[in-house]
Every structure is written in C-alpha cells, then in structure tokens.
Amino acid sequence: MTSDSANQAPASVAYPKNIKSFVKRAGRTTTGQAKAFEVWGPQFLLKYAPETLNMVKAFGMNGQDATIGPVIFEIGFGMGEATAHIAKVRPSDFFLCCEVHEPGVGALLKRIGEQDIHNIRILQHDAVEVIDNMLPLASLDGVHISFQTLGTSHVTTNADLFKHL
C-alpha cells in the first residue's frame, strides 16, 4: 500500500473525506463545572449512540401528542455563554448542542442550572458522527457553527461539514 492509497477512503463511503468538527483543546474542569456534570448532567446531557435520536424524548416531552418547536443544531459552543443567552431569549426553540471540550460542557451545564434553562440538550461528541448517525432526516430548523475558523483549511472544513447536513 502506498502513502497515496492510505489516505483514500473506499469508493462506497458516502463522505470519502474524514472530517473532524473539532480539535481537542487543553483545559481544566473547575470544581463548579464538575459539580454541574453531577447535578445537571443527567437531565441535559445526551449519550451518543449510532441510532436515530427521538427529538421529542430527548427534550423530555412526554405523551402521545407531544411535539417540540424548532430544533437548532449548535456545533462548538465553547464555554456556552452565547448558547445560554440565545436559548433563554428563544424559549420556544430547542437547542441540540455538540461540544467535545469538557470544561465548555461543564460551563454550559452550570449556566443551564443557574439560569433555569430547559430547552438545551448537549452531546459531548463529534458533530459529524452525530449528524451522520443520530439526526433524523429533515429534523433541523437551523444550524449554528460556533467554533473558531481561522485560515483557509478551516473554511474548507466548514464547507465539508455543511455537506453532511
């Protein structure tokens, strides 16, 4: 196998280029963020599973006729300040948020709990895998991409990411 063929995906793959929607950053989880994982994690953190996500159940709506409002998929919310703000001012929208940075997830969980926000759910997982494996077709009403995109290669990554949607 040559080095050229090692970088090529099989022809049967829908998205032949491997795309990562994140870069793991160094950082420490504070005591408050760790406590937020314990206290609010069970209610607001969703576990990644390679199966279609039931949005109604994910957002805690019960009953046969339960529905939810518009679903916004947010990729890379950082420390969650903007996410918490927009979710609070748009209470009829539902925010499904992906972030891999543990301190950021903890910070958003802390904000959710302290500000009594109920329309956010968090997946601490790669957004590309979530898009490919968990999101039902036509289930999103909007997408926010909030991670830092400096340089040409990141612009290309964003374009490739949108191909998944």
Regions found by a protein language model. Give the residues of each.
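S-adenosyl-L-methionine
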Residues: 2-73, 81-90
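SAM cofactor-binding core of SAM-dependent methyltransferases
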Residues: 61-132
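A short acidic, Gly/Pro-enriched loop at the edge of an enzyme's catalytic core
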Residues: 133-142
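Residues lining the SAM
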Residues: 146
